[in-house]
Amino acid sequence: QRQMCIRDRCEAFRQRGAALSGLDVYVASNVPKGSGVSSSAAFEVLIGVILNDRFMAEKVSPIAIAQIGQWAENVYFGKPCGLMDQMASSVGNIITIDFADPAHPDVEPVQVDFSQAGLALCILDSGADHADLTDEYAAIPNECRAVAAVCGGEVLRDVPFETFIANLPACRKQLSLIHI
């Protein structure tokens, strides 16, 4: 699968005018496969950054590198993934992303210092694998639109946070599979 990941990124860069030639790259990681920390997106972005550096003189933006990753997931692997994981890996840090125009998402950094709040990010290997969740991932955009509709909007970006919070009980009642 990793070889295919590299081939499809190369194809995307060829389509953007890259004159690719041989290249030796060695990568090591101890991130468990399927651990849910976007390791696939990080690998896709790594390949994009390497190709961009070596063959495109860094002309491809971090946003475009993320979009290449999404395109490859959709086209070559048949995974209806969005752009969030690739964008977070490519742009880096904590960001907000507005997908009002999917071809040109608005990306803004969020300034936060977890240590000042006495917090730390810990990653644990739960042993769970999310590799077979394609249908669940594909359902997320429709579920978000359903929540927005309950809150009086078409998409969640149009719903003020206060309205969203105020409508949580209605969302749970109308949209939950299990009513409590």
Predicted regions and their residues:
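C-terminal nucleotide
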Residues: 1, 96-178
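Gly/Ser-rich oxyanion-binding loop with an adjacent helix/lid
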Residues: 3, 7-116
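Short, intrinsically disordered or compositionally biased N-terminal tails of bacterial proteins
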Residues: 5, 179-180
